């Protein structure tokens, strides 16, 4: 929690990765140490829910359990998930399964052609079908704000955020969003984000690109 004058703001980073993603290297202890300046953080490893529970229970981090999912038509993130969602289900089905868990559909790096973006046309289609809750317009792995996605989000009255997409510990919180208080649940987070501010900083240091294969953990999967 941060106070500027008489105003209290809550800093949140809704797109981060730990070593469980396979293409990131951050151990959980180091992750917890680097997340200290944040008031709420979403753990969104690729196809894995293990780290969020450990960071909450063993390190007392205020976390949202999430997952970045390869739909076969680009990536989406599910927030407030209780169960992992299979990959390659297609965009619409993946979004519906997130909603079935009372989770939030978060679209990361929507038009970034260097990554698994869904693209502006598919994003517009999902918005028209009321299958999107949050759109990421600032990502620390990009030098620019996604103005095209931001205009689309505003036209559908959807909240926009900036997030780090941290794959190394020092990137955690490099881009973030501020809200007025901590949310009690998923729907309240969306409401708070409609009156939020985002802060974007490009931050993409060189990292080891060697991919680590993560085996399932009986204790970590919900």
Pin down the residues of each PLM region:
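Divalent metal-dependent hydrolysis catalytic cores, especially in the metallo-beta-lactamase
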Residues: 13, 17, 31-47, 103-106
């Amino acid at each position: 929690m941060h106070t500027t004058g008489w105003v209290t703001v809550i800093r949140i980073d809704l797109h981060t990765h730990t070593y469980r993603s396979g293409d990131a290297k951050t151990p959980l202890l180091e992750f917890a140490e680097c997340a200290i300046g944040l008031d709420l953080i979403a753990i969104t490893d690729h196809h894995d829910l293990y780290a969020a529970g450990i960071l909450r229970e063993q390190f007392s981090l205020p976390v949202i359990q999430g997952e970045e999912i390869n739909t076969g038509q680009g990536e989406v993130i599910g927030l407030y998930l209780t169960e992992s969602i299979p990959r390659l289900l297609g965009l619409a089905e993946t979004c519906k399964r997130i909603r079935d868990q009372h989770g939030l559909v978060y679209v990361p790096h929507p038009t970034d052609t260097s990554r698994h973006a869904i693209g502006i046309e598919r994003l517009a289609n999902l918005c028209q079908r009321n299958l999107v809750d949050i759109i990421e317009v600032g990502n620390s792995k990009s030098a620019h704000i996604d103005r095209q996605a931001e205009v689309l989000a505003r036209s559908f009255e959807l909240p926009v955020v900036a997030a780090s997409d941290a794959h190394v510990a020092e990137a955690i919180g490099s881009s973030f969003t501020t809200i007025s208080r901590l949310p009690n649940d998923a729907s309240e987070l969306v409401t708070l984000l409609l009156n939020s501010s985002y802060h974007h900083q490009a931050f993409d240091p060189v990292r080891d690109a060697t991919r680590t294969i993560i085996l399932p953990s009986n204790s970590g999967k919900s």
